[in-house]
């Protein structure tokens, strides 16, 4: 492996500007790494070599002319395969979209290409972003770079594994209930979900529109901050996009956090926590105290309801959003239907995987006449209570911390026959999506088997700069982020 691939995006940018390496060389080195690793890792559904090298050549031309480079120009990136890139397959890891070629770019893709960021390929995911282990892909499972027998987390497992294994330096994922933060935790990297509306969802294949948010993966907090800056901003094509100026998130990374009020979420520090994760949390609390922060315990009384709320609201929205995949306009169509109704039924039965079908049925039930008030409406009311818990908590503290997950990565197949156990993996992450607040997972140590542990940090809406500052100070107080998977 080219040693430069192990470096951060900030270090790679410096090497490009100093002409120590060309963007084409860096991109080709990343493709070589992918060809070495990906048969056993399974992180990519497809590669976009021509697009990536074309972008890299533009970077080299700018350098040759002595022109300034846009932020992150020339840095290899993977795009989760539920975001559109014109002319490439966008499958959402589903048979129903197996041969769908995108006719337009997602807004985040446009922003990346505008900043000359080479997009090397489309990263594997749980089908339609539904899952916590990346075992639900219709094509292949993703393996954890730290131990190939274990899951990388989901649903953005391919994005996380590609960054963790140094196939690419950066990646984009989407987070509906923890789908960026959980794989970041399991793969020992940084993963961040912005405030809802901070990043445009235009061109993202929808799962649950009121919860979905695109965010960055990186190996350092600084790189994640810069990637969020590139993809943020108002988009008239997305009605939920916030009309706010883009911040320079990396500007406050090194601000002193003396006196920062840190709240430890009481409900996420009790039963179910593995001994290794509990020890890592204790160490993280001590680290913040040494940095001058004041640490207190905070209770979020309605947090215990968050999984129930989420699996009513998310499945209801999924049932509605996925109705468009019916075999009429695009995607897979069953070859042997005798009439229109049979074509709908067979196409969806053959095209969707078991987890997607389970969620469509759950959501359709929650929205059906007679159950709407009992389930969907009540879940919306409870969502407001969870959000209010955060509002009250942030009156007392500046940030909240918890484990990203009560446990480290589990073995492939260990939970696939028990959906409820799989759903509980997201116990710590779901509430941030319900409340629309920004959250991040940063490396916080390793368990007895050498598997990464993640610390989750949450901040009030639109306080991404505070989040990055608190995360960066913790990151630099340790060397966890410097340790790479030995794959």
Spans of features found by a protein language model:
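Structural helix-boundary/capping segments
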Residues: 36, 165-171, 176-271, 278, ...
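General small-molecule cofactor/ligand-binding pocket signal
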Residues: 120, 294-299, 440
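Short alpha-helical scaffolding segments that buttress acidic/His motifs in well-ordered protein cores
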Residues: 26-30, 309-310, 356-364
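Short helix-loop capping/hinge segments that flank enzyme active sites or metal/cofactor-binding pockets
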Residues: 72-92, 251, 256-265, 316-387, ...
């Amino acid at each position: 492996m080219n040693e430069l691939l192990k470096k951060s995006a900030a270090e790679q940018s410096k090497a490009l500007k100093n002409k120590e390496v060309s963007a084409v060389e860096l991109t080709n080195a990343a493709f070589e790494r992918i060809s070495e690793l990906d048969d056993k890792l399974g992180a990519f559904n497809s590669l976009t070599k021509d697009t990536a090298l074309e972008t890299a050549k533009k970077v080299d031309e700018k350098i040759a002319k002595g022109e300034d480079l846009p932020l992150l120009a020339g840095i290899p990136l993977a795009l989760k395969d539920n975001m559109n890139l014109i002319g490439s397959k966008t499958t959402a890891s589903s048979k129903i979209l197996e041969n769908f070629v995108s006719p337009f770019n997602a807004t985040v893709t446009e922003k990346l290409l505008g900043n000359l960021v080479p997009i090397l390929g489309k990263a594997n995911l749980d089908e339609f972003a539904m899952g916590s282990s990346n075992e639900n892909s219709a094509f292949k499972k993703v393996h954890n770079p730290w131990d190939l027998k274990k899951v990388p987390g989901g649903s953005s497992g391919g994005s996380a594994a590609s960054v963790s294994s140094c196939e690419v330096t950066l990646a984009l994922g989407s987070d509906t209930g923890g789908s960026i933060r959980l794989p970041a935790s399991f793969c020992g990297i940084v993963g961040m979900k912005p405030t809802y509306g901070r990043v445009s969802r235009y061109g993202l294949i929808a799962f649950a529109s009121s919860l979905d948010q695109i965010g960055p993966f990186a190996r350092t907090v600084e790189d994640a901050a810069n990637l969020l800056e590139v993809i943020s901003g108002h988009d008239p094509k997305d009605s939920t996009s916030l009309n706010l100026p883009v911040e320079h998130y990396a500007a406050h990374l090194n601000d002193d956090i003396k006196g920062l009020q840190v709240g430890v979420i009481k409900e996420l520090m009790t039963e179910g926590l593995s001994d290794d994760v509990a020890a890592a949390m204790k160490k993280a609390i001590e680290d913040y105290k040494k940095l001058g922060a004041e640490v207190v315990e905070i209770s979020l009384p309605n947090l215990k309801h968050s999984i129930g709320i989420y699996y009513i609201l998310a499945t209801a929205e999924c049932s509605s959003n996925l109705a468009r995949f019916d075999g009429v306009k695009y995607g897979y169509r069953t070859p042997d239907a005798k009439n229109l109704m049979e074509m709908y039924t067979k196409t969806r039965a053959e095209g969707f995987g078991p987890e997607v079908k389970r969620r469509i049925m759950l959501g359709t039930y929650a929205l059906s006449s007679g159950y709407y008030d009992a389930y969907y409406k009540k879940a919306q009311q409870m969502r407001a209570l969870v959000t209010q818990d955060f509002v009250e908590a942030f009156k007392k503290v500046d940030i909240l911390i918890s484990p990203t997950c009560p446990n480290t990565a589990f073995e492939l197949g260990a939970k696939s026959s028990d959906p409820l156990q799989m759903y509980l993996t997201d116990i710590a992450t779901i509430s941030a999506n319900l409340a629309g607040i920004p959250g991040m997972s940063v490396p916080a140590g390793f368990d007895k088997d050498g598997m990464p542990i993640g610390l989750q940090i949450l901040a009030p809406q639109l306080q991404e700069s505070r989040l990055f500052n608190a995360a960066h100070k913790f990151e630099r107080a340790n060397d966890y982020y410097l340790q790479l998977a030995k794959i």
